[in-house]
Amino acid sequence: MQRKKKGLSILLAGTVALGALAVLPVGEIQAKAAISQQTKGSSLANTVTAATAKQAATDTTAATTNQAIATQLAAKGIDYNKLNKVQQQDIYVDVIVQMSAAPASENGTLRTDYSSTAEIQQETNKVIAAQASVKAAVEQVTQQTAGESYGYVVNGFSTKVRVVDIPKLKQIAGVKTVTLAKVYYPTDAKANSMANVQAVWSNYKYKGEGTVVSVIDSGIDPTHKDMRLSDDKDVKLTKSDVEKFTDTAKHGRYFNSKVPYGFNYADNNDTITDDTVDEQHGMHVAGIIGANGTGDDPAKSVVGVAPEAQLLAMKVFTNSDTSATTGSSTLVSAIEDSAKIGADVLNMSLGSDSGNQTLEDPELAAVQNANESGTAAVISAGNSGTSGSATEGVNKDYYGLQDNEMVGTPGTSRGATTVASAENTDVITQAVTITDGTGLQLGPGTIQLSSNDFTGSFDQKKFYVVKDASGNLSKGALADYTADAKGKIAIVKRGELSFDDKQKYAQAAGAAGLIIVNNDGTATPVTSMALTTTFPTFGLSSVTGQKLVDWVTAHPDDSLGVKIALTLVPNQKYTEDKMSDFTSYGPVSNLSFKPDITAPGGNIWSTQNNNGYTNMSGTSMASPFIAGSQALLKQALNNKNNPFYAYYKQLKGTALTDFLKTVEMNTAQPINDINYNNVIVSPRRQGAGLVDVKAAIDALEKNPSTVVAENGYPAVELKDFTSTDKTFKLTFTNSTTHELTYQMDSNTDTNAVYTSATDPNSGVLYDKKIDGAAIKAGSNITVPAGKTAQIEFTLSLPKSFDQQQFVEGFLNFKGSDGSRLNLPYMGFFGDWNDGKIVDSLNGITYSPAGGNFGTVPLLTNKNTGTQYYGGMVTDADGNQTVDDQAIAFSSDKNALYNDISMKYYLLRNISNVQVDILDGQGNKVTTLSSSTNLTKTYYNAHSQQYIYYNAPAWDGTYYDQRDGNIKTADDGSYTYRISGVPEGGDKRQVFDVPFKLDSKAPTVRHVALSAKTENGKTQYYLTAEAKDDLSGLDATKSVKTAINEVTNLDATFTDAGTTADGYTKIETPLSDEQAQALGNGDNSAELYLTDNASNATDQDASVQKPGSTSFDLIVNGGGIPDKISSTTTGYEANTQGGGTYTFSGTYPAAVDGTYTNAQGKKHDLNTTYDAATNSFTASMPVTNADYAAQVDLYADKAHTQLLKHFDTKVRLTAPTFTDLKFNNGSDQTSEATIKVTGTVSADTKTVNVGDTVAALDAQHHFSVDVPVNYGDNTIKVTATDEDGNTTTEQKTITSSYDPDMLKNSVTFDQGVTFGANEFNATSAKFYDPKTGIATITGKVKHPTTTLQVDGKQIPIKDDLTFSFTLDLGTLGQKPFGVVVGDTTQNKTFQEALTFILDAVAPTLSLESSTDAPVYTNDPNFQITGTATDNAQYLSLSINGSSVASQYVDININSGKPGHMAIDQPVKLLEGKNVLTVAVTDSEDNTTTKNITVYYEPKKTLAAPTVTPSTTEPAKTVTLTANSAATGETVQYSADGGKTYQDVPAAGVTVTANGTFKFKSTDLYGNESPAVDYVVTNIKADDPAQLQAAKQELTNLIASAKTLSASGKYDDATTTALAAATQKAQTALDQTNASVDSLTGANRDLQTAINQLAAKLPADKKTSLLNQLQSVKAALGTDLGNQTDPSTGKTFTAALDDLVAQAQAGTQTDDQHQATLAKVLDAVLAKLAEGIKAATPAEVGNAKDAATGKTWYADIADTLTSGQASADASDKLAHLQALQSLKTKVAAAVEAAKTVGKGDGTTGTSDKGGGQGTPAPAPGDIGKDKGDEGSQPSSGGNIPTNPATTTSTSTDDTTDRNGQLTSGKGALPKTGETTERPAFGFLGVIVVILMGVLGLKRKQREE
C-alpha cells in the first residue's frame, strides 16, 4: 500500500522514562469505593449459606487480592506483575480494616427515620472509640499509624500494610475483613508556581470559567472526582448544545458538565476512557489542563491550570492492543469537531518526529482551519532531543550536524503554539534525612533503598567508616573490614566491586546495614543500583556521603537518627538543567521558528483513571499547561469589565489565535543555562522562554501591546543569510490610548548575540556569545496610541565569524509605562543548502559496535528474504567498513545476492526526492521511486530502533521501450542514486553509490597443493589461480575447501601474486583435519569461490601431496571412522532394522575389500571403480546393534594384496524408553502443566522433552513438568545416546486449561485482524467491491465467548464460527468497535476492527491516442493528460519508472478527490516505442494505458508531381498530385500556404485562375518543399448569364423559404428543403460563383421543392387512427407487451408512437404505412418464434393432414408469406392466421400428450381439439374453412370498424384481450360445445378483414 505515512504514524508525545526519579506512591487512603463494595458483599453473603460463602471466598481470594493489588499499584505507575515474588510480598498497600461489630447505622442504636445529626455523630463516635484495641493490634503488625476512621456506614479504619502481612491482620480478633483501597496521589503545586498560575487565580479570579478546551488524546475518565466544575450553571457548552451537535454529527454524546462531549474517534464508539493499565496519558493531560480537586490535602486532589474550564474528550487512540498509534483521518476528525463544537483551545500532546509545514499535510491543514474558526491549537514539541544525539534523544550532538531539529508534526503547524518542556523544581520520592539531634542534618536526599522493609533499619544505629590500606574510604573489600563493623552501618565507596558484592561483604562482616557513597564528586544521588533485597542498603551522593564520613570519623561512638520516607525534595534534574533534556530542538526544517514557548513538563503530577494520580514527564505534560493558560487568557478576553474588551471582541479567527500566542511569547521569561555561565538556552530549544501566565494576564488587563516580526510572527525568522550585516523589521502595536516608547535592554547576557556550540567532552549543545556581534535599532521606538510602528534593526556580525552557524538570541524591550516585551530571533549564517542530506558510506553516523551502520547498501536473497550488507569487509583488527568497489549483485537466479537496495541515514528532511539507477554512461535505467518528502533518520525510543529511509530494490531488470517487455540488464557498472532538495533549501543534492551487476562466476584454474614449514610444522595450502572480470573476487576473501571430503567452510584466502594474463594467485591453508586426511596419491580437492556479486565457482581437482611420488590408497574423510552411528557421514538407514555405510577414495587401480558383520563373519564389500578419475566407492551393510567390525581393502579380487586395514565399531543401538507416561496416561488435562515421566536405557546421554532438557537420576529416570496451552499440544520426547543415535516418542494432549479466557479468544479468517486492515478492490477476498459489503468470518475459542461488533451482538454457531457483514463503501478509514466477553466471567475487553480501503481505481486520460499508433519525427515525446481518483494521493509511473507522486499522508476520509496533471518527457528510440503509463492510488489500485509511438528522424521528402486535367481554356480544371514515394500524403493550399488540406482522390477542382501550393507529408510529420502550380486557363462566365443565374436562384430561394414556413408539409421533406435552401444560399454567396455552380444549386433546390410531401389530411388521420386501434386490439395484451428486439420497445409502445405521430400529422400516410408494416413484420416474427418454441419437435415435425406439410412448415410458410406482403392489411391478416395456427398446434400438442401421437388428427370438435385444419394459403385467408373446433389465442379477436361491420350482437362482451366471452358472437370456453355453425366465427373474421381491406383500398383511391 502507498499510504505508509510518517514513519510510525502519530505517536503519543508520551512520557519519558523517569529513571532515577521514578516516583513512589504516597498519600492517604480513600475508602468510599471500598465501603460500597463491602456493603454489596454483605448483601450477597446473605443469599448463600455460610459454608458456600466460605468456599467461594477460598476459591477467589487469591485471584481477587492479586488483581486488586495490581490495580491499585498500576494507578501508581508500578507494574505488580514485573515485581519478583519477594517484592510482591514486601510492597506496602492501602487497606480498609473492617470490624466485626456493626456500624452505627446497623447496630440498632439509631432510628434511620428520625435520628438527628447530633445523635448520628454521637453513636458514630462510640463505634470509632471501640476500635482502639483492634487498632493497637493492627499497628503492631503494620508498624504504621492507623489512618482515617469510619463508624456510621462501615465500622473500620484505614492503614498501610505490606502484602505479606495482610493475612496477619485478618487473624486479629474483632477484624471482619481487610479490603484493598484505592490510592490517590498528591498534586505538585510547584509547576503552577513556576509559571505564576496561582497569582492569576488570586489576583484576577480567572480559573477558566466559560471556556472549553479540547483534549485530543487517549481519553478522559469523566467520573474522576476531580473532573468537576464548582458551578455548572454558567457553562459555555450545555447539554442542549451538545445534543444539537451530536444530532448533526451523528456521533459522540454528553457526559457531564465538566466533560460535556466526548467520542472515541479511533474505535468509532462512545468509550472515551483509556483502558491502558500502566498509565493513562490523556487523563494525565486533562488533569494538567483542568482538574478541579477540592480540599487542602494535596494527597486527595489535583488542581489544573484552568480548573473551571470544560474539557472535551476527543479520544484518538484506540483501546485496541493492536496499535499504540493514530492516523491522519482520525486526528483530522477530532480537530474539525473541536472547532465545530466551539472549543476555545485544543491540545494535542502527540506527534511524529521532525515534521514540516506543508498544508498538504492533513493535520496541519486541519489545525490551520481550526485557527481560522477561532480555536487556538497547542501542541507538544516532542521528546526526541536532537537528531544528532544518537540513541539518547537528548540535547547532544555527536555528529556535528548543522540541522539537528526534531520538532514533530503537527507541532510544526504555523498557527499552533508549540511547547517545549522545562523540569519541575521539586519531586516527591523516597528520601533520607540523617540527624544527630543537635546540629547535623544531611538531607533530605533521594535514595534507592534495597527494600521497603528496611525503612527503620538505619535509625538510631552507630556508623562505621570502612577504610582501605591507604586510609581512604574503602570500596567495600572484605579484607578492609574489622570486627568493629559488627552491628553498625558500614559506609563504603562506589567502584570496583559489584553492588551485591559490597552488600555480601558488609553482611559477612556483621554490619547492620550499608551506605554506598557515589564516586563522581557531585551532589548526584546513587539511585540506579542492582541491589539485593535481603540486606539494608542505600546510596548517597559524593557531597552528602563525604559529610557523613567526616561526621562519623569525628563521632565514631555516636548514633544517628535516620528517617526514610516519601518526601518532597528538589528535583536533581532541575539543578542540572532547567530544561528537560528530552525536549525536541527546533527550528522547523525550513528554518521557521519552533518551538514557541516552554512550560513545566518534567516530573508533573496529575490525574489517572479511577480517582488515581501519577507522575509523568514529557512535552506531553508541558503542552496542556499552555492549553490551560490560553483558556485563562481567553477568559480574560471575554471579561466585559476588561478595559480592552471592545478591542478583543474584534479579534476573529487567526487574528484571535495568533494574538493569544503572541501575548504569551511576548511575556515569556527566557531561561538561562546554569551549566554554561548562565548564557541563554537556545531559542531553538526553549522558544520564547518559560511561560509567565500572570505576566500574560497582566498584559491583557493593563497593556496588550505586542511586538512581532515583519511577517507577523512573534519571533524573528532570519532564515539563511551570508552578509555580516542583516537587517530586519519589527512591528510594534500600541493597543493603549497613550503613546508608548520602548528601549531595548542592553543586558550583556540575555541580549547578546549567540551561536550554537558543542561541549567536546559530553556532546551537550549550548549557546555561546558571538564576540563583536550586536543588534541595533535604526531609530527610536515610538508607537502612537492605537497605532503600529515598524522599526528596522540591523544584526552585525564580526567579519571573522565563520559561516554555516546559527545566530540567535532574545530582544527585550522596556516600555515607557513599565511594560516589557520579549522577542526571540533565530537565523542561519551561511547557505542552508550546504548541509548534506545523506550520510556517506562509513560516514559520521557509522557505528557498527552500536548497531548503526549508517548509510549502507543491502543485498537481498529473494528465496529467503535475507539481507546482507553490500561490500562489507573486515580488517585485521576486526573493524568493519563498506568497500564501495565491492558492492555487487547477480542476475543469476542461483546467486546469493539477487537485488540491491539502499538503507539511507538521512541527515535532513528532503523534498522532491528521486531514486534512480544509472548505467555506466550515466544514462537513467529506471527510476525506483519519487517522493514529495522524506523525514530525516532518528532513533525512535518507542520502537528502540533507528528510522532509516529504506529505498526500493533493483533486481537488475529494465523496461524495454521497444516492445514494452521487462528484460534483464547487461552486466556492467551502475550507480544507485538518490537526489533531493533539503527542506528550506532550493538546490538539489545528489548522492551516488557505485555497484556492479555481474552474472558470471569467476574462473578458477591450476588447483594444487603446496606446503610451507612454519614454526617447525608443515602447513599445507590449497592453491589456485582465479579471475573475475567484473565485480572482482570476494572482497572478504572467504572460500570453502574440501580435501578428501574433509571440509573447511570458514576458510579465507590470501593473494600470492598475479599472472601475466591477469589471474590472481590464491592460497588457503588447510585445517589440521584436512592435512591429516592427505595421502600419498590422488587427493580429491574442492575449492568453492565466489565473486563480490555472489556468483560461485565450485572447482574439483585431483591433487598430489607435495613431495609425494607414490600413489597409495586414499580413503576420503580421513579414512573409515572409529565409530559408525546414525550420525556418521555415509550412513543411510533402511526400513529393515539396519542400514548401509558407504565410503569412497582414490587408487590407481580397482579396489576390492571385505568387512565383518555383527556375527563376526566376513563378507565382500560392494565396490565400484572409475578408471578415469582413479576413484572408488565401497559400501557395507550394518545392523542396528553395537559390535566391532573390520574392513580390509585389497588391490586384487583374490584379496592377496592388502592395501589398508580398518577397525571400527558399529554403534546403531538406539536408546529405549520404558514406562514412558504422558500426563499419567490421560489424553486430557485441565491443568497448566502435565508430567512426562519415564526411564531410559543406560547409554542415554540426554532426554529432551519439548524444549526442556530432562534431568536423569542414577536409575536413568526422568520427570518433567511440561506447560500446555489451551487446545491440542503435541509433546515430543527424544532420547539421545553418546553416539548420537536418537529415539523419539510423541503424544497429543488436549488441555482445557485457559488462564485467560479472553486472550486470543477471537480469530478472523482471510487475513482480517484486530487493528488496521488495509486493502483495495482486488486484495481482499472478504470484500465485494460491487456492493461495498465486507463479509467477516472467524471463530471463537470457547462456546462461552461473546462477540459484539459496532454495538451489535454477533451470533456464534455451534461449531464456534461466526459471520457478519459490514458496509464499508468504497473508500475511507472505517473503524468498528469490538467488545469480546465471556459468559462465565464478568469482564470484557475492547478491540477495534479498522478497515482502510479504496475500491475504485484511478482514471487516466491521455491526450495521445492509446488506440492507434502515434507517428513523430521528434525524439522528445511529451506524455500529457490527467489522472483523477476518489482520494487525494496519486503516483505516476512511465515505463516502470516512478516519475511523480503526491504528498503521501492523506486524510482518506476527507472526501476530496485526487487530481494529477501529467506532463512528462520521454526520449524516443528510433522505430517502435511502447510507452506504458500507470497511475496508482493510495491503496495500490492501478490504471494502466499504453501509447505506441513510431519515431523516425526528421527528413525532407521529395516534392509531389502536379498534373492538370487540361491546359486548354475551360470553366474548371482538376489538379491531381502524386507523391514521390508510397506512404506519403499530398496536401494543397489555395490561400498561399496559410492552410493545407489533403488532395481529394478525384483531384482539386479549380474554378478560378490562381496559384496553388502542393506538398507531400508522411505519418511522422516530415514534409517536402511546397511546389506552386499556377492555373491560368479558366474561362470566365458571361457576366449577363452569371447575373441571370444569380437572379433565378435568388427567386427560387425565396419561394423555398415561403414553402418551408407554410407548415403544410411533413417534417422530413421540410427539413430536406431547408438544407437545400442553405446550400443554395452558400453557392449564391461565393465570390467566385460560376454559372455552372449556380445552375447546379438551382437544380438541387428545385428537386427538394418537388419532393415536398403534404402533412396527413384530417380524413386520412381518422382512418389511420382507426386502423392503428384495430391493430392494437388484434395484438392484445400478451403479444402487445412483448419487446421488438430491433428497437427495444414493446409492440404496444411502438403502436402508441405511431398514434402520436398520426395525431401530430407530421408524416404522410405512406410513411405511416411503411412504419406500421415494419412493426407487423416484427410481430409476425415474434409470434411465429413463440409458436415454434412452444411446440415439441415430435409435434412440430408431424404432418398437418390438411396441408400435407409439417406444423413447422405451416408456421414458416405463414410467416414468410406475411412478411413478403407489402400491404399492412395483408400482414394483419397473416397475423390472424398465425394466431389461428397457434391454437391448432396447441391442440395437437395436447392430443400428443393424451394419445401419444403428434400428427394433428386426434382432436374432436366437442373437446376443442379441432380437425387439425391446415394454415390457409395466402390467397385463402378470410375464406370459411369450417368449424376449427377451437378459439383463437389470446388477442386473436379483432374488433370491427363500427362503420362497416355489424356481425356481433349488442349482447356480446369481450375479455381484456378482446376475446368474445358472452353473447351471440362468443366462442365456447374450453370443454364447452356449441351448436352454432362453424362459419359464424369465421364470418366475423372475414367481415373484419374485408372492412379493413376495403378501407385501405378506398384510401388509396382517394
Swiss-Prot record:
Location of this chain's protein in the cell: Secreted, Cell wall
GO annotation, cellular component aspect: extracellular region; membrane
Chief location of this protein within or outside the cell: secreted
Reactions the enzyme catalyzes: Endopeptidase activity with very broad specificity, although some subsite preference have been noted, e.g. large hydrophobic residues in the P1 and P4 positions, and Pro in the P2 position. Best known for its action on caseins, although it has been shown to hydrolyze hemoglobin and oxidized insulin B-chain
UniProt key word Metal-binding: no
Active site: D217, H281, S620
Pfam assignment, any one: fn3_5
Biased composition (Polar residues): 1830-1843
Family the entry assigns: Belongs to the peptidase S8 family.
Record protein name field: PI-type proteinase
Gene name for this UniProt entry: prtP
